[in-house]
Amino acid sequence: MGGAGAGMQLDINEIQKFLPHRYPFLLIDKVVEMERYKRIVAIKSVTINEGFFQGHFPGKPVMPGVLILESMAQAGGLLLLQEIPDRDRKLLYLASMDDVKFRRPVVPGDQLRVEVDILAWKGDRCKIRAKAFVEGNLAAEAMLLCLMVDRERANNSGK
């Protein structure tokens, strides 16, 4: 895969080069569209094999809303990390969420289509608009603020 512009796509192996998340917390399976400095469209295939369905909820499995938000944040992080030249020395954190709305449940068998647009980027902060769709229907939406920090500084801050 790979490429440039709006047609840029990434498979799971390429995604893992950018995101530090791994199973069971990597919530993006592929990128189907990416326009540098602007937007990304990513896919999460939701299956009954996801560990969270064991307890959320027995007999009526529903993807937890916080994990839908996490998939949005991961897609946003993937887009932002494309633009950082020294990304191996940086970490992205989710700093805040605003206007979060859940519109419909996401269940096993659904394909979550996550669309993220960069609204503003100033210094180490970036504001993004994220939406998640299932079969063309809005499932969730949020405004997210991401914060970029030096990896070494973040690793030393807990001492």
What are these language model-derived features?
Residues 1-33, 159:
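N-terminal leader/capping segments at the start of a protein or of a new domain
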Residues 2-9, 76-113, 139, 146-147:
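Hydrophobic beta-strand-centered segment that forms part of the acyl-chain substrate-binding groove
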Residues 7, 20, 36-37, 107-110, ...:
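HotDog/MaoC-like acyl-thioester-processing domains
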Residues 16, 59, 102-104:
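Beta-strand-rich interaction surfaces with strong enrichment in secreted/lumenal proteins
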Residues 23-63, 68:
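Catalytic strand-loop segment that frames the active site of acyl-thioester-processing enzymes
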Residues 25-27, 112, 126:
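Hydrophobic core residues within well-ordered beta-strands of beta-rich domains
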Residues 31, 42-44, 97-98, 102, ...:
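A structural signal for short, well-ordered beta-strand segments
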Residues 56-87:
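Helix-adjacent hinge/juxtasegments
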